Design a protein with these regions (language model features):
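Conserved P-loop NTPase "ATPase switch" module shared by AAA+ and STAND
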Residues: 81-98
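Conserved lysine of the Walker
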Residues: 30
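Interdomain motor-coupling "hinge/lid" segment immediately C-terminal to the ATP-binding subdomain
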Residues: 126-175
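Short glycine-rich substrate-engagement loop in P-loop NTPases that contacts/grips substrate
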Residues: 52-83
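Structural recognition of the conserved hydrophobic beta-strand(s) that form the central parallel beta-sheet
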Residues: 113-119, 140
Length: 175
């Protein structure tokens, strides 16, 4: 399925030395899009979903140094998750906000790329200790726009271009 934000995630995977935070409403495709882009990139993915794996909230959402956190994280990773080859994906990050505080140090350490996603983050993350300014790229996703919806429904490029031209010139569309 085509989403315009896929280009942003693709570029982040290729070039960025920052973590990525993907926010937006529930059920708009954040998790799906992140998984898709990581799969296409050739990176391995280690995913932690803090709603599906609530025991990991208690394990990771405690005050500890970044080094201690990294050791704990590596303990739960499969052996095939190698440094420089793996993207660590924290999904539903609003359930484990302490990780956002540690991202600066994890990014500086450089073993892995980090992507986080969650819903209602503006409300849920108010209590974090420190926002990692300069170490985090934020992408706000929205529900599909009309063009994305049309592409998902296999509307041809020619038809899309015609509809766009009609819209821009305020002309009616033929039935």
């Amino acid at each position: 399925m085509y989403r315009k934000d896929s280009i942003i995630i693709e570029e982040w995977l290729k070039r960025s030395d920052k973590a990525l935070l993907v926010t937006g409403a529930r059920q708009i495709g954040k998790t799906w899009l992140i998984r898709e882009e990581i799969a296409k990139s050739g990176y391995r993915k280690f995913e932690v979903n803090f709603i599906d794996q609530p025991d990991l909230v208690d394990y990771l959402n405690v005050k500890m140094s970044a080094n201690e956190f990294l050791v704990k994280l590596k303990m739960i990773m499969p052996e095939d998750c190698k440094p420089q080859e793996t993207v660590v994906f924290f999904d539903e990050i609003q359930k484990c906000p302490e990780i956002v505080t540690k991202i600066k140090f994890l990014v500086e350490e450089g073993s892995f790329k980090y992507v986080m996603s969650g819903s209602l983050l503006g409300v849920e993350l108010k209590g974090i200790t420190s926002v990692p300014v300069g170490y985090l790229t934020v992408l706000t996703m929205y529900p599909m726009d009309f063009e994305e919806f049309m592409i998902a429904n296999n509307v041809s490029k020619t038809t899309l271009e015609m509809l766009k031209a009609k819209f821009e010139t305020c002309q009616p569309v033929d039935e």
